């Protein structure tokens, strides 16, 4: 009896141990699979409460296992509302923490403009220091830097004031902590030149001017990072809200000789402007993530309607970089692996068709559901009348079906003329309801009709709500290019 009892006990123990091992393996494998997160490019990100993330022109600081994202949170008129802070462990799921600086933090912030906020940590003073560009909210002539500090990364920051560094005007700027020595990089002389300053040991002030780069070349939106002993400085041109060719330079010492400027990305940096470059250090590699803003001002929108563009940088050599487009970015903060890709059309999903020129969504006029209702562009409002499914029509063509009405995009009366109205209609089996998706590069597409060989166009290159959708001969215009944003 004792032997049988002992045998049963041993069998029971073996089952428990094997069960625990299986559970352990299951948990580990699921944890590994869940590590990589997918981010869609060119959209407005949302936090864990479903609110739009307002962190434009900002930067990220990693503290412990969390990434803290600081950025601009503006009023509808573009003036300063707050510097908002979000945190995430995976760069996908963002929790709003607080508005670390607000318009009530100091008198000169009540009516002001605050741009490009960046936070660095001073290990000697145990302070988190926030630098930003300050203007008076009335004109754009003050051109000062401003500073605030806090003893906690996502707590309330105490405003220290604004000033011109060593008397120089300062607009677009960033700060960089080089292993305890910090630098301010800012556009000066009305953006004509780029100055690099060394900060004081407490990071609250400017100690000295290190050097002036690219005199008269009008560079802005600086972002500095260091890779394998080489410093990279990324900038954009100065063309207002409109995107332009991103460029970079390198040096082996911040205070030494910098290279000439070289291009990266395409001619518009994929319709974005640099804000920050984030090193993502993992168990197998370190990836450098370009973080850019797709400013809504380019389509006459409000600043807080702007989108985000994140892409991994590649390094052909120790002193060169490149950046390729991908509509989706896979982020694995555990391994440090970041990849960009552009998946094929998902015929089970719905998409928002966003016009490149107007920044607005293709919509059925008045959210109509009837045959013959015209199509227009309208700011993305979350309506089903702005969501479309691609249904294969064979031979590389698609029917594009509206989510609200179940009807297809077609050309009015099957007309072959330039200017013919684009409408919705029940599926009639006509080739005027068939569309080819033509790659326009950098995540932009043309929608070409099978019957007419013409492109869906927004009439007159309008950027306004209600701009009419028509067909027109392909002329390469941005108003004929569309972004396919998957509804998540």
Region roles according to the model:
Residues 14, 18-22:
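Hydrophobic core
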Residues 341-488:
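Lectin-like carbohydrate-binding module/patch detector with strong preference for beta-trefoil
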Residues 33-347:
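Carbohydrate-active catalytic/glycan-binding domains of CAZyme proteins
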Residues 1-5, 25, 247, 303, ...:
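Composition- and surface-driven signal marking solvent-exposed, interaction-prone regions
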Residues 22-36:
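Sec-dependent signal peptide cleavage junction
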Residues 2-14:
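Bacterial N-terminal signal peptides that target proteins for export
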